[in-house]
């Protein structure tokens, strides 16, 4: 008998979830630090995705999915932000939101628009769970409400 643990392969869904989380972190870093998309994608792919940092091992992430979200949000931000702003309550401006919440919403809305192969429920659930990883209060509810409103506008399956 061997004492070594056998590594189970990470399921594709888990790799996509890890890619979504990494994309939100990268978008946050770009928003706060002013880092460019090429630099941030290279940094994450070389030093973060599936790597050990400060004793914590990051889940293996689908690098293509990560790249698609980050570059897609940057490319389509002028289309994403008005949709998000319209889905917020009247007294809230997108600029008033926490940078992390903005990153979560932008990534989620990008997937709703661009990844028609992924069910709405999967996208909304994944990004609400990401919000729950960062916030205990009302932010996950806000993410859920905004993504749900936008999904009903842009996806026929969510209109039911």
From Swiss-Prot:
Entry keyword RNA-binding: yes
SUPFAM superfamilies tied to this protein: NusB-like
GO terms of molecular function: RNA binding
Gene3D superfamilies with a match to the protein in the record: NusB-like
Record keywords, A-Z: RNA-binding, Transcription, Transcription antitermination, Transcription regulation
Domain of life of the source: Bacteria
GO biological process: DNA-templated transcription termination; transcription antitermination
Matches recorded under Pfam families: NusB
Transmembrane portions of the chain: none
Cellular component GO terms, alphabetical: cytosol
Family designation: Belongs to the NusB family.
Stated role: Involved in transcription antitermination. Required for transcription of ribosomal RNA (rRNA) genes. Binds specifically to the boxA antiterminator sequence of the ribosomal RNA (rrn) operons.
PANTHER family, alphabetized: ANTITERMINATION NUSB DOMAIN-CONTAINING PROTEIN (PTHR11078:SF3), N UTILIZATION SUBSTANCE PROTEIN B-RELATED (PTHR11078)
HAMAP family per UniProt: NusB
Protein name (record): Transcription antitermination protein NusB
Recorded name of the encoding gene: nusB
């Amino acid at each position: 008998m061997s004492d070594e643990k056998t590594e189970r392969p990470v399921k594709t869904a888990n790799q996509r979830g890890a890619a979504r989380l990494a994309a939100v972190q990268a978008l946050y870093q770009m928003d706060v630090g002013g880092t460019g998309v090429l630099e941030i994608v290279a940094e994450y792919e070389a030093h973060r995705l599936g790597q050990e940092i400060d004793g914590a091992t990051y889940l293996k992430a689908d690098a293509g999915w990560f790249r698609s979200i980050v570059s897609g949000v940057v490319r389509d931000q002028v289309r994403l932000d008005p949709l998000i702003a319209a889905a917020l309550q009247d007294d809230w401006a997108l600029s008033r939101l926490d940078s992390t919440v903005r990153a979560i919403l932008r990534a989620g809305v990008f997937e709703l628009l661009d990844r028609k192969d992924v069910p709405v429920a999967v996208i909304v659930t994944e990004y609400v769970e990401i919000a729950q990883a960062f916030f205990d209060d009302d932010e996950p509810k806000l993410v859920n409400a905004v993504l749900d409103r936008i999904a009903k506008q842009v996806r026929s399956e969510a209109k039911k």
